[in-house]
């Protein structure tokens, strides 16, 4: 072995180690189903929906759906907490620094706890609701018909397919119908939240857990 070959043999592992370490550090961890009530939670496994239970792990990029009356809570390390409302179907994000979860239908409440420089978003066929830092927000979608985003605390930004954006601060919401322009500004959410029997009933930031639409005494 000549000197050049020997040097290459030393340098190659030295170069690869930091790269491998960086790749391993960036790999997101699996999430956990920390709560499940009112029905079933299923994941798509080899083209078949299979029921999963509280305490089981869920992986990045997995497709999940809840039963007609089920509410499931999922904790994702370095991202936050997701609460799937009844009759919801989602695909969990794949990138730890830009964790975009796709929602085909239903309602998804997101509580983020993101490291600096990271972003999380809920993507629907009509719009994308994105957040950086810490926020509590809920997104409701009716497939390709409409989408609604409501913010409990912090700020989120909703972007339509044509690139138009609207900020949604704490205590406000925005609703977008398919084929319609994004509203110029968000509206106060109080009139909607005070109505029982709405899709917002399961939101844990404003409503009593399992309270069937009952608002928390300190929700304002």
Indicate residue ranges for each PLM-predicted region:
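Absolute protein N-terminus
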Residues: 1, 25-26
């Amino acid at each position: 072995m000549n000197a050049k070959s020997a040097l290459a043999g030393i340098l190659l592992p030295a170069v690869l180690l930091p790269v491998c370490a960086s790749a391993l550090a960036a790999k997101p961890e699996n999430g956990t189903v920390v709560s499940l009530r009112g029905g079933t939670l299923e994941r798509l496994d080899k083209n078949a929906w299979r029921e999963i239970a509280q305490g089981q792990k869920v992986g990045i990029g997995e497709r999940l759906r809840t039963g007609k009356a089920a509410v499931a809570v999922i904790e994702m390390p370095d991202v936050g907490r997701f609460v799937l409302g009844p009759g919801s179907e989602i695909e969990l994000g794949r990138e730890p620094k830009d964790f975009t979860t796709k929602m085909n239908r239903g309602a998804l409440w997101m509580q983020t706890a993101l490291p600096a420089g990271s972003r999380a978003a809920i993507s629907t066929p009509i719009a994308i609701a994105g957040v950086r830092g810490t926020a509590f927000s809920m997104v409701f979608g009716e497939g390709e018909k409409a989408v609604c985003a409501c913010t409990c605390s912090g700020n989120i930004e909703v972007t339509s397919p044509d690139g138009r954006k609207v900020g949604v601060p704490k205590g406000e919401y925005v609703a977008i119908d398919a084929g319609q322009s994004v509203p110029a500004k968000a509206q106060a959410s109080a009139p909607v939240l005070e109505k029982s029997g709405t899709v917002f009933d399961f939101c844990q930031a404003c409503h009593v857990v399992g309270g069937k639409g009952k608002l928390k005494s300190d929700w304002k």
